[in-house]
C-alpha cells in the first residue's frame, strides 16, 4: 500500500483580477507540508500547470523551490509533470540531477513508459501532450488529444506488467465527463479536445490535472482541481487535495480541504439593497463580483460599493428591463446619423431614459465639433500627401 497526495494546477504566480496570489499559494504549500507529515504521505503528485506562465517570476520560482524542498524534508517523494501553462524545457531543467534528491520532474516525451517507483507502486507521470508536437514522435495515429494519450498509454501498458505493485498514471488533459470552469485555458485542437476515460483502463488510479474543479470521473479517475479558486465560477467549489491509498485491486481516496485565504462572493441586486442588506455581511471580507440591476446606472457605484465591500474586484451592470438588442450592428449604424447614434447610446446606458432636449443640444454641439476636428485632420493629411508627392 502506498499513500499519495494528488494535487494539480497550482498556477504559481497567477493573479486573481489583478490581485496577486503568491501569499495564498504559499499558505497552501505550508498546509501541504503539514499534511505530508501528519498523514505519512509517501509521494506528492502534481499533475501539471505547476506555474501559471511559461516564464515565471523569480519570486514564483523561489516559492516552488522552497515548497518542494520542505515536502521532501517532510518525507515525501515529489513528482511534477508539466501542463499546458508550463514551459517543458524550463520546468524540466536539471531533472535527472534533481531526481536523485527525491524531486522527479517529467516534461519529456522520452520517458512516458518509465515510471517513478515508490514502495513498489509504479507512477507514470505523463506531461501535457500537445498533439501537433507529440503525435509523430510517439507514434500516434492522428493529431488529436485522444490519439496522443492512447499512444502514451500504450507505452505505459508495455511497461506495467513487469512491475509488482499497483500502477498510477498522472495526466494533464480534458477527459469526457469533466466540468469546466472559466479559468482553464482551452486545449482544443480543431474543436476536439475531450478524451474518453477508457483510455486509462487498467490503471489502478489516474491523477488528472487541467480542470480546476475537483471531480470524480470514475472510481479510479479523478481531478484534484486547483487548490485555490482562480475564477468566480469556482466560488462554490470545495478546494483541496486528494489523499489516496492504493495497492493492486484496492483504492481509497478522500479530499483533504485546503485553507481558504479569502472567500469569494457573487452578489446581484440594486445598489441601495446591496449596501443595506444584512444578509451580505459575510461578503464584506470576501473578494466580490457584483452585478447591479438598477434601471439607471448609479453615479460612483464602485466607490459606494467598496465602502461596504472593499475587495470588490468585478462590477457589471444589467439594468432590469434594459434593451437587449445590440445597438452596434452594422445595419443599425448605417441607418442612423451621428447625433441619433449618440442619443441612442445615452438611452441604452440609462435603461431607456431618452436624452432631454438640453442633452440633445449638447450632443449636437459635440458631434459638430468632432466633424470640424476630423475635417481639419483630413485636410492636414491631404496637404502632407501632396507635399510628399511634389
PLM regions with names:
Residues 42, 77, 104:
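Residue-level detector of anion-binding/catalytic polar loops
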Residues 56, 82-207, 211-216:
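His/Asp/Glu-rich metal-coordinating catalytic cores
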Residues 72-80, 284-286:
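Short, surface-exposed connector motifs at secondary-structure boundaries
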Residues 197, 204-260, 266-267:
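A conserved active-site cap/scaffold subdomain adjacent to cofactor or substrate pockets
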Residues 63-75, 192-202:
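Catalytic-core regions built around general acid/base machinery
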Residues 38, 43, 246-390:
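Accessory, non-catalytic peripheral segments of nucleic-acid enzymes
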Residues 1-69, 73, 365-369, 389:
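N-terminal active-site segment of His-dependent metallophosphoesterases
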Residues 9, 29, 44, 49, ...:
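Divalent metal-coordination and catalytic microenvironments
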Amino acid at each position: 500500500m502506498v499513500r499519495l497526495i494528488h494535487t494539480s494546477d497550482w498556477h504559481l504566480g497567477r493573479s486573481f483580477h489583478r490581485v496577486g496570489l503568491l501569499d495564498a499559494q504559499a499558505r497552501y504549500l505550508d498546509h501541504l507540508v503539514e499534511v505530508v507529515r501528519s498523514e505519512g504521505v509517501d509521494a506528492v503528485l502534481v499533475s501539471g500547470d505547476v506555474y501559471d506562465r511559461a516564464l515565471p517570476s523569480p519570486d514564483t520560482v523561489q516559492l516552488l523551490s522552497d515548497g518542494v524542498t520542505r515536502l521532501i524534508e517532510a518525507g515525501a517523494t515529489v513528482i511534477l509533470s508539466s501542463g499546458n501553462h508550463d514551459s517543458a524545457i524550463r520546468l524540466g531543467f536539471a531533472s535527472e540531477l534533481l531526481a536523485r534528491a527525491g524531486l522527479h520532474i517529467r516534461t519529456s516525451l522520452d520517458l512516458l513508459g518509465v515510471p517513478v517507483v515508490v514502495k513498489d507502486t509504479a507512477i507514470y507521470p505523463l506531461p501535457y501532450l500537445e498533439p501537433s508536437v507529440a503525435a509523430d514522435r510517439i507514434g500516434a495515429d492522428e493529431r488529436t488529444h485522444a490519439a496522443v494519450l492512447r499512444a502514451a498509454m500504450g507505452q505505459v501498458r508495455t511497461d506495467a506488467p513487469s512491475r509488482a505493485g499497483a500502477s498510477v498514471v498522472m495526466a494533464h488533459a480534458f477527459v469526457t465527463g469533466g466540468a469546466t470552469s472559466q479559468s482553464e485555458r482551452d486545449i482544443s485542437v480543431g474543436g476536439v479536445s475531450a478524451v474518453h476515460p477508457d483510455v486509462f483502463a487498467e490503471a489502478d488510479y489516474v491523477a488528472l490535472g487541467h480542470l480546476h474543479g475537483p471531480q470524480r470521473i470514475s472510481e479510479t479517475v479523478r481531478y484534484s482541481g486547483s487548490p485555490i479558486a482562480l475564477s468566480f465560477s469556482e466560488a462554490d467549489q470545495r478546494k483541496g487535495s486528494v489523499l489516496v491509498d492504493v495497492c493492486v485491486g484496492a483504492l481509497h481516496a478522500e479530499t483533504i480541504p485546503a485553507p481558504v485565504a479569502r472567500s469569494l462572493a457573487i452578489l446581484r441586486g440594486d445598489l441601495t439593497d446591496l449596501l443595506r442588506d444584512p444578509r451580505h455581511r459575510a461578503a464584506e471580507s470576501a473578494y466580490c463580483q457584483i452585478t447591479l440591476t438598477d434601471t439607471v446606472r448609479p453615479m460612483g457605484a464602485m466607490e459606494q460599493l467598496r465602502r461596504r465591500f472593499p475587495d470588490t474586484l468585478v462590477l457589471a451592470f444589467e439594468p432590469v428591463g434594459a434593451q437587449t438588442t445590440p445597438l452596434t450592428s452594422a445595419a443599425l449604424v448605417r441607418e442612423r446619423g451621428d447625433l441619433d447614434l449618440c442619443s441612442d447610446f445615452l438611452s441604452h446606458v440609462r435603461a431607456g431614459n431618452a436624452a432631454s432636449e438640453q442633452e440633445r443640444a449638447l450632443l449636437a454641439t459635440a458631434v459638430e465639433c468632432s466633424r470640424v476636428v476630423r475635417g481639419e485632420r483630413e485636410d492636414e493629411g491631404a496637404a502632407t500627401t501632396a507635399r510628399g508627392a511634389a
